[in-house]
């Protein structure tokens, strides 16, 4: 996809505040400091469209951005930051469950994992939700420039085991080298293809009349 324009639309915490309209949505999820902001900024060719919070995990908002006139990019709040107050942590679960299970515009979720970190229970919970709600995941492994090839292979094996993933499901990404940018876009573009229900059908021509029996 060629990104010509990306603009912030609004923030929301509940369905009543979600943007109206029928644009498909691709959401981005991951724990705090996983590189979500860098991934989004590289994909849309912007430096500060999504900013890294100075207090990770404190902002529990779902942020909606419109990309061209094609789709909504949805930035989900980060999770897993140890210093987040308990009350904030309790808000995160119902907010995520509601969006993932009820949002009809949602086409898929880019689930972001750090190549240097072992997946957490929150990561597994997110993937479990996506599978339970039939939301297609795109698994993106970030910060790949920070490890050697051997370490990448070792960590990939751990991620696949912990998350019950296959090798072909992993998409490697580096904000520094831009490795994986095109591959991630290809996955997103595939999810944005119109579904059968959204594609106007071509009326069938009436069948030619059969032979008439006297």
Swiss-Prot record:
Gene3D superfamilies: P-loop containing nucleotide triphosphate hydrolases (3.40.50.300)
Molecular-function annotations in GO: GTP binding; metal ion binding
Residue ranges of every copy of the EngB-type G domain listed in the record: 22-194
Name of the coding gene: engB
GO biological process annotation, one example: division septum assembly
General function of this protein: Necessary for normal cell division and for the maintenance of normal septation.
Keywords, in A-Z order: Cell cycle, Cell division, GTP-binding, Magnesium, Metal-binding, Nucleotide-binding, Septation
UniProt similarity note: Belongs to the TRAFAC class TrmE-Era-EngA-EngB-Septin-like GTPase superfamily. EngB GTPase family.
NCBIfam families documented for this protein: GTPase_YsxC
Entries under InterPro entries matching the protein: G_ENGB_dom, GTP-bd, GTP-bd_ribosome_bio_YsxC, P-loop_NTPase
Protein name from the UniProt record: Probable GTP-binding protein EngB
